[in-house]
Amino acid sequence: MPRKLPSSPKTSALQLGRAVAWPGSPEEAKLDRVPNPQKGTNYVARFTAPEFTTLCPVTGQPDFAHLVIDYVPGSWLLESKSLKLYLASFRNHGAFHEDCTVAIGKRIATAVRPKWLRIGGYWYPRGGIPIDVFWQTGTVPKGVWIPDQSVPAYRGRG
């Protein structure tokens, strides 16, 4: 039997463990955070979203990306269900690749106030050109191992 979060004012506001509606837009989406039980330890947490989708703001055509989000938590952890809902809210949102990638990184950084965060947005080609976008909050804390994001360069069929 899975362990349930104890009910408290902090946990009752979470989307985790409850049925919630998909947010209609990134602005409507809520990012939840939970206390970090290892806040005295520097470590890296990684979220990977290999099937992120959004819309081109000009043509309305779908755009696809492989997102990799690495962060060194401070006092808070990013709750993964809320991240999933937030990323899904971009499905009908129109924005350029650079704006999507940087906005996601900034929103997460604001929500959880990590010691460090980076996001890599590896966008699939539109018009024959793949676009990769990278953003981070500052320098990596000393002594923290940051693995490579391991997303190969786009090669097409060649």
UniProtKB/Swiss-Prot annotation:
Query: Does the UniProt entry include the keyword RNA-binding?
Result: no
Q: Where in the cell is it found?
A: Cytoplasm
The annotated active site, in chain numbering, is 56, 63
GO terms assigned for molecular function: preQ1 synthase activity
In the record, biological process GO terms are: queuosine biosynthetic process; tRNA modification
In terms of domain of life, where is this protein from?
Bacteria
Please report which protein family the annotation says this sequence is part of.
Belongs to the GTP cyclohydrolase I family. QueF type 1 subfamily.
- The protein here is known as NADPH-dependent 7-cyano-7-deazaguanine reductase
